[in-house]
């Protein structure tokens, strides 16, 4: 039979409270950092330098530091910078995963984030990071990744794929000036299927997400109009999801 102790105040209760009296899970963050290069969707992986699962490829991440990290987002930015040399301006929480089997060290919880970053803008920092490397998503999903990172990667890609269908997030990969054909190509690489050209152009222009400039570039045999991003936030939501082309079959 347990004895209930009556405390005179919350302050008195907290004064005697010992966190070590209660078992706590391991607490980590993991990041799925996507980009596009050479016509393929890429994912940033790191090679683990310590046990457990030493030398396995994994998503960048690490333990929450109770002294340094004011919140989970701060931890995600800190670990990403430590492991890869980059600090993504955009990180979005995808899911929290916890169980007794995902980490051999014990009961573990991780908070999964994803980001979509410009490949060229961050490549120099990543090249100076000894254990990080860009891998195509197709290659990464064939690897025996550390812990449950194969499942985490699939969850993060599902979120990216879904957000591509209703937000302007892929425009963050574009240079300051671009053609609508170039932008459509980025969307198609992430989605994995073709889009109807007229519908895509109408969507981008009528929503006000892009605006014409007074410049053009030669594309094929004729000049193509150059556009720029017209909003402040890449997480702009379109009123409708992108539709599959008519010949697409599920």
UniProtKB/Swiss-Prot annotation:
Regulation of activity: DNA binding is efficiently suppressed in the presence of ADP-ribose (ADPR) or phospho-ADPR. Accumulation of ADPR resulting from NAD degradation may be interpreted by the cell as a signal to activate recycling of nicotinamide.
MF terms in GO: catalytic activity; DNA binding
Motif (Nudix box): 62-85
Disulfide bonds listed in the record: none
Keyword Transcription regulation in record: yes
Annotated region described as Winged helix-like DNA-binding region, given as residue ranges: 164-237
SUPFAM superfamilies named in the record: Nudix, Winged helix' DNA-binding domain
Domain Nudix hydrolase: 26-157
Gene null: resulting phenotype: Deletion of the gene leads to a 150-fold increase of the basal level of nadV expression.
Alphabetical keyword list: DNA-binding, Repressor, Transcription, Transcription regulation
Cited InterPro entries: NrtR_WHD, NUDIX_hydrolase-like_dom_sf, NUDIX_hydrolase_dom, WH-like_DNA-bd_sf, WH_DNA-bd_sf
Pfam families to which the protein is assigned, alphabetical: NrtR_WHD, NUDIX
Task performed by this protein: Involved in the transcriptional regulation of the nondeamidating salvage pathway for production of NAD from nicotinamide. Represses expression of the prs-nadV-nrtR operon by binding to the DNA region located upstream of the operon, thus blocking the nondeamidating pathway.
PANTHER family in alphabetical order: ADP-RIBOSE PYROPHOSPHATASE (PTHR43736), SLR1690 PROTEIN (PTHR43736:SF4)
Protein name as annotated: ADPR responsive transcriptional repressor NtrR
Protein's organism: Acinetobacter baylyi (strain ATCC 33305 / BD413 / ADP1)
């Amino acid at each position: 039979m347990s004895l209930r102790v009556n405390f005179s105040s919350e302050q008195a209760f907290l004064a005697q409270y010992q966190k070590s009296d209660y078992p706590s899970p391991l607490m980590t963050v993991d990041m799925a950092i996507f980009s596009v290069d050479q016509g393929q969707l890429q994912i940033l992986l790191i090679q683990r330098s310590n046990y457990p699962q030493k030398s396995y490829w994994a998503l960048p991440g690490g333990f929450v530091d109770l002294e340094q990290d004011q919140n989970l987002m701060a931890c995600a930015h800190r670990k990403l910078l430590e492991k890869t040399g980059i600090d993504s301006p955009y990180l979005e929480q995808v899911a929290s995963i916890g169980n007794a089997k995902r980490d051999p060290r014990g009961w573990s919880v991780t908070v999964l984030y994803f980001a979509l970053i410009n490949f060229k803008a961050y490549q120099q920092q990543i090249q100076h990071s000894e254990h990080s490397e860009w891998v195509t998503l197709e290659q990464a999903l064939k690897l025996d990744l550390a812990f449950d990172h194969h499942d985490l990667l699939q969850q993060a890609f599902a979120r990216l794929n879904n957000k591509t269908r209703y937000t302007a997030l892929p425009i963050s990969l574009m240079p300051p000036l671009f053609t609508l054909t170039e932008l459509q190509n980025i969307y198609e690489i992430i989605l994995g299927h073709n889009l109807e050209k007229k519908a895509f152009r109408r969507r981008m222009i009528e929503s006000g997400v892009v605006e014409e400039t007074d410049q053009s570039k030669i594309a094929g045999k004729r000049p193509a109009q150059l556009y720029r991003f017209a909003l402040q936030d890449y997480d702009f939501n379109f009123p409708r999801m992108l539709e599959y082309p008519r010949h697409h079959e599920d």
